[in-house]
Amino acid sequence: MEIRVYDKNLIFLGVVEDFKSLIWTRKYYEPGNFELHAAGTDKNIQLLQAGNIITKRGAKEAGIIGAYTDQEGSNTNQIVRKGNFLGSYMSRRILHYTHNFSGTYEDGMRYLQQNVEAIPLLELGEKCGDTTQVCFQTTWKNCGTMLTKLAKSSGLG
């Protein structure tokens, strides 16, 4: 398995060398998370900085490096990086003011994403065609929390 690293502008930085384990946790209704244990080489330390993005070759998901620790000792020279999948960017956005919506769940989710501070390079995929209707009002809420609530109540992942 190849772990590729990009900066926040999606410029390819390199490939992680000699990693011990990768826990890649997918979640259906909300962004997943990961934990990477790798050799503490100079190259890995340089690549695996907070804010950089990792992905498995061929995977649809990618994660943002958040917390990390370096473990050095006579028996170990290992780095640990943890983070959340890119969907977690929505949890960094607040829905300012009052928003009223009536339509399909899918259109409601898209509406919320379009009414927060723009996320550079964000592109929404094709519509899935869900026709289930919803009405909601939100004021000063976390966008990620609202998207998770809509996903759970509609069954859309």
Where are these regions (language model features)?
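Juxtamembrane "anchor/assembly" segments of surface/extracellular structural proteins
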Residues: 1-47, 82-88
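Catalytic micro-motifs at enzyme active sites that drive phosphoryl/nucleotidyl and oxygen chemistry
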Residues: 23-24, 67-72, 136
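Residues that flank catalytic or metal-binding motifs in active/ligand-binding sites
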Residues: 32, 79, 154
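Short beta-turn/strand-loop junction motif enriched in small, turn-promoting residues
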Residues: 41, 69-70, 155-156
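Short coil-to-beta transition motif at edge beta-strands of beta-rich domains
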Residues: 44-56
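Short active-site-adjacent helix-start/loop capping segments
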Residues: 44-46, 63-64, 73-75, 89-92
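Short beta-strand and beta-hairpin "edge-sheet" elements
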Residues: 54-84
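Charged- and aromatic-enriched interaction segments used to assemble
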Residues: 84-157
